[in-house]
UniProtKB/Swiss-Prot annotation:
Keywords, sorted A to Z: Antibiotic resistance, Cell inner membrane, Cell membrane, Cell shape, Cell wall biogenesis/degradation, Hydrolase, Membrane, Peptidoglycan synthesis, Transmembrane, Transmembrane helix
Encoding gene (name): uppP
Bilayer topology annotation: Multi-pass membrane protein
Spans through the membrane: 39-59, 85-105, 113-133, 151-171, 190-210, 220-240, 249-269
HAMAP family: Undec_diphosphatase (MF_01006)
One GO term (biological process): cell wall organization
GO cellular component: plasma membrane
Keyword presence, DNA-binding: no
Name of the protein this chain belongs to: Undecaprenyl-diphosphatase
Lineage start: Bacteria, Pseudomonadati, Myxococcota, Myxococcia, Myxococcales
C-alpha cells in the first residue's frame, strides 16, 4: 500500500465513520474508483483507532465524567445514582449485542459480506428506515431521559452495523431517533457508544494484521490512522453543529443515490461485486480459511 492510498483511505475513514453514510462502504468503493485493491476489513478496523482517538479527545470531559461517576457509584454502592453513572452503564450494556453478534455470526460476516451488492442494498434499506424514523420520531427526549431499555435497544441497532454498508453511526443514530431522542443527543450517544466496540475491534485486528504474512507497511498504518484521527475530529464537530438545526434527510438522499449508482455500475459490468477483495490467511497455515472479519461499520 502506497502512502497516497493510506492518506486517501484515512481521509475517507475519518470523514465517513461518524456520518450515517457507512465508512466501510466508502473504504470498499474508494479503491475501486482508483483501481486499488480492497484494503480489507482488518485494515479498516485498525485505522478506526484513529477515529476512536478523535472521539476520546473531542469528548474527553464527558468521558472523564462518565468514568469517574461509574467508579464512584460502585464505591458508594449506588451504581445508578447519577445520570453520568447510568450513561456509563448504558454504553457498556449497549456494547454487548454487537460483541455477541460478532462472535456468533462471524462466519457469516466475513469476506462474502464485503460484496458491493450487500453494501448497496444496506445503503438503500437503512436509508429508507432512517427516513421513516426521522419523519415519525418526536425528537423531544434528551440523554437524561434514557432508560435501560433505551441503552439495550440502541445497542441492538449497533449490531446491525456488522453488515457492511449499514453504518454504525447510521444504525445507532436511527435507533436513538426511533426512541424519541433529539438529533444531537442521539449523535452524542452514538459517538460514546462507539468507543468500546471500535477500540476492541481495532486492537484485535491490529494484532491479527501484524501477524499476517501479507500486510500494509507500518508507515501506511500510521499515516492512515493519523489522517483518520484529524478528519474524524472535523467530522464530529461538523455533524453535531449540523444536527442542531437540520434533519438527516441529506444523508438519506446520499445513501440512496450511492446505493442506486452502485447497483447500476454492477448491473452494467462496470464494477465486479468482489473485485479487489483479498483474503488474509492465518500465519503458518497455508490454505487456511480467511480470518478477516468485519467488526463494526
Amino acid at each position: 500500500m502506497s502512502l497516497l492510498e493510506a492518506i486517501v483511505l484515512g481521509l475517507v475513514q475519518g470523514l465517513t465513520e461518524f456520518l450515517p453514510i457507512s465508512s466501510t462502504a466508502h473504504l470498499r468503493i474508494a479503491p475501486e474508483l482508483f483501481g486499488w485493491r480492497d484494503p480489507g476489513a482488518a485494515y479498516s478496523a485498525v485505522i478506526q483507532l484513529g477515529t476512536v482517538a478523535a472521539v476520546l479527545i473531542y469528548f474527553r470531559k464527558d468521558i472523564v465524567s462518565l468514568v469517574a461517576a461509574f467508579f464512584r457509584g460502585l464505591a458508594r454502592r449506588e451504581p445508578f445514582g447519577t445520570l453520568e453513572a447510568r450513561l456509563a452503564w448504558f454504553v457498556l450494556v449497549g456494547t454487548l449485542p454487537v460483541g455477541i453478534a460478532g462472535l456468533t455470526l462471524k462466519k457469516f460476516i466475513e469476506n462474502e459480506f464485503r460484496s458491493l451488492y450487500v453494501i448497496s442494498g444496506s445503503l438503500i434499506v437503512l436509508a429508507l428506515i432512517l427516513l421513516v424514523v426521522e419523519k415519525r420520531a418526536s425528537h423531544q427526549r434528551t440523554l437524561a431521559d434514557m432508560r435501560w431499555k433505551d441503552g439495550i435497544l440502541i445497542g441492538m441497532w449497533q449490531a446491525l452495523a456488522l453488515i457492511p454498508g449499514a453504518s454504525r453511526s447510521g444504525t445507532t443514530l436511527t435507533g436513538g431517533l426511533s426512541l424519541g431522542l433529539k438529533r444531537e443527543d442521539a449523535a452524542r450517544y452514538s459517538f460514546l457508544l462507539s468507543i468500546p466496540a471500535t477500540t476492541l475491534a481495532g486492537v484485535f485486528e491490529l494484532k491479527h494484521l501484524l501477524e499476517a504474512e501479507t500486510r500494509p507497511s507500518a508507515m501506511a498504518l500510521w499515516v492512515g490512522t493519523l489522517v483518520a484521527f484529524a478528519s474524524g475530529m472535523a467530522a464530529i464537530a461538523w455533524l453535531l453543529r449540523f444536527l442542531r438545526t437540520r434533519t438527516t434527510l441529506v444523508f438519506v438522499v446520499y445513501r440512496v443515490a450511492l446505493g442506486v449508482l452502485l447497483l447500476v455500475l454492477l448491473q452494467t459490468g462496470k464494477l465486479s461485486p468482489m473485485s479487489g477483495v483479498e483474503n488474509v490467511e492465518v500465519p503458518g497455515e497455508p490454505g487456511a480459511p480467511p480470518v478477516e472479519k468485519q467488526i463494526t461499520d
